[in-house]
């Protein structure tokens, strides 16, 4: 799990979940995120005068490579309209491992079309189902 908030680090109690203090995007960079842990509505938009902390942004592909992951089975993302950027940074992973996907499609008006296109460009074998503003994708087993 990649997520920038301190609360997550305190609350995760599962042995098979490792919180990583990074965000996901289409390039390796930095972003400024709010330090206010009381704000847990799913996003951290900074307005004029607010301060925050620098958070490292990586790609799914770079993370998989750096961690030498032998498999990736599932990617779930509700990242406030940044799903398309995450998918652009996951092309190699989608092509190589074909993980099942569960993504939100309600943040931007063209999310349903854009996200499906990005997935199928990375791996044309994916079958996509969209319902209730969610996108589910998997490569059928042979």
State where each predicted segment sits.
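Phosphate/nucleotide-binding beta-alpha loop and adjacent structural elements of enzyme active sites
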Residues: 4-142
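A detector for short metal-coordination/catalytic motifs
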Residues: 1
């Amino acid at each position: 799990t990649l997520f920038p908030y301190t609360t997550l680090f305190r609350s995760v109690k599962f042995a098979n979940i490792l919180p990583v203090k990074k965000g996901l995007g289409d390039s390796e960079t930095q972003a400024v995120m709010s330090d206010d842990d009381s704000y847990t509505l799913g996003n951290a938009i900074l307005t004029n005068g607010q301060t925050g902390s620098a958070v490292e942004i990586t790609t799914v592909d770079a993370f998989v490579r750096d961690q030498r992951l032998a498999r990736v089975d599932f990617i779930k993302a509700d990242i406030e309209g940044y799903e398309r950027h995450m998918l652009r940074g996951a092309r190699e992973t989608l092509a190589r491992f074909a993980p099942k996907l569960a993504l939100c499609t309600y943040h931007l008006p063209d999310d349903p079309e854009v996200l499906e296109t990005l997935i199928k460009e990375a791996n044309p074998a994916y079958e996509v189902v969209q319902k209730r503003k969610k996108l589910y994708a998997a490569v059928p087993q042979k």
